[in-house]
């Protein structure tokens, strides 16, 4: 059910990719384990059918409750796919300075650090879903960049991927940003309006289409290693077990 009116048009994702092919401890991550993507809540019925036919059995929705209220769950709600709502930011409005909202690569890196510290329990649950769902798990936020990028990084760290490979995967979204912004504009515009932000003004202060996206993810990984040594320390403290990591690695390398 939606509580905010918006002209919601069903469309195919523009930032969807299987994480298969990335080098991890012991080999290469297989396809069909984890899919990162932009919003799945308003995909077309054909896309929903294709994802399920391709082995999708679980969806991890990292968006805030308000974002979910804007879109509902869409065509995938009609399929036998487990749905896990695990907001990494409970209130998007509270995560930003209303007087000086900063949408820069550096600001995103700081926000990612706050996500890992503040939403570690949700990240642990998400990793358990990926570890134990019988098929493929797809995880998404709105754009498939920030919250999705943080979960992808935690998954790849658990699998033993190198920081450079994690950053490279994250930066692939850069080529899709124009399409992402076009696809998400109606939903994000409705959300910003509901939160009391001026969407047009936010767009003018954003520099996310400029420079290198690497900065944000590199900042997160460097900070985690500097603060903890083991970048998974915040998640371990929140309950991430060696058994879950072992299960993830077993599934990631399975033929």
Segments (PLM) and residue ranges:
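Cys-dependent protein tyrosine phosphatase-like superfamily
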Residues: 1-138, 150-255
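Ser/Thr-glycine-rich phosphate-binding loops at phosphate-binding pockets of nucleotides
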Residues: 143, 147-148
């Amino acid at each position: 059910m939606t509580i905010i009116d918006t002209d919601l048009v069903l469309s195919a994702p523009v930032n969807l990719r299987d994480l298969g092919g990335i080098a991890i401890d012991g080999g290469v991550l297989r396809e069909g384990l984890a899919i990162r993507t932009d919003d799945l809540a308003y995909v077309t019925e054909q896309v929903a059918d294709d994802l399920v036919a391709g082995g999708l059995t679980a969806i991890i929705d990292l968006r805030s409750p308000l974002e979910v209220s804007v879109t509902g769950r869409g065509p995938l709600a009609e399929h036998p796919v487990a749905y896990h709502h695990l907001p990494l930011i409970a209130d998007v409005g509270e995560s930003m300075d209303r007087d000086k909202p900063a949408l820069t690569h550096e600001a995103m890196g700081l926000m990612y650090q706050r996500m890992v510290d503040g939403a570690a329990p949700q990240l642990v649950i998400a990793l358990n879903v990926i570890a134990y769902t019988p098929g493929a798990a797809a995880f998404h936020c709105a754009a498939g960049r920030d919250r999705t990028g943080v979960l992808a990084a935690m998954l790849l760290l658990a699998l033993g991927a190198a920081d450079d490979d994690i950053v490279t995967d994250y930066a692939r979204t850069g080529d899709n940003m124009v399409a992402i912004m076009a696809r998400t504009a109606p939903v994000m515009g409705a959300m910003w309006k509901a939160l009391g932000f001026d969407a047009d003004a936010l767009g003018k202060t954003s520099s996310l289409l400029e420079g290198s996206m690497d900065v944000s993810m590199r900042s997160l990984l460097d900070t985690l290693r500097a603060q903890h040594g083991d970048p998974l320390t915040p998640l371990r403290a929140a309950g991430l077990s060696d058994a879950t990591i072992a299960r993830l690695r077993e599934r990631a390398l399975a033929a």
